[in-house]
Amino acid sequence: ASPEAYVEYRKQALKASGDHMKALSAIVKGQLPLNAEAAKHAEAIAAIMESLPAAFPEGTAGIAKTEAKAVVWSKADEFKADAVKSADAAKALAQAATAGDTAQMGKALAALGGTCKGCHETFRE
């Protein structure tokens, strides 16, 4: 695959993850009565986070204007660990949603958002 294909893939994957977060936020805030659907959104985020490190192979830094910092590649193990943390947090949210525990869903969504923020602070422009 071309480096450009990897860049496009990760842009789309991260956009999808963000869109799932927006949907989850609306559900958790009670704007939509779709608690049963929340687990699906959380599971999608977990899947994206699990696959994300593979979308940043060597040779794809600086290919196009992106928000990824060079530290993604120089601290690849830390980047992978952050992706795992996000995946685990998304799985915890899915479990809370499956159990119908709205209070725990709110806590789990906040925890997931915290993992996203932590990764963004280190690895995103």
From Swiss-Prot:
Complex and partners: Homodimer.
Entry superkingdom: Bacteria
Gene3D superfamilies to which the protein is assigned, alphabetical: Cytochrome c/b562
GO cellular component, as recorded: periplasmic space
Residues the entry annotates as binding heme c: R10, E67, C116, C119, H120
Pfam families hit by this protein: Cytochrom_C_2 (PF01322)
KW DNA repair (keyword) present: no
Biological processes, Gene Ontology terms: electron transport chain
Entry keyword annotation includes Transport: yes
Organism expressing this protein natively: Pararhodospirillum photometricum
Post-translational modification remark: Binds 1 heme c group covalently per subunit.
A molecular function (GO) term: heme binding
Record protein name field: Cytochrome c'
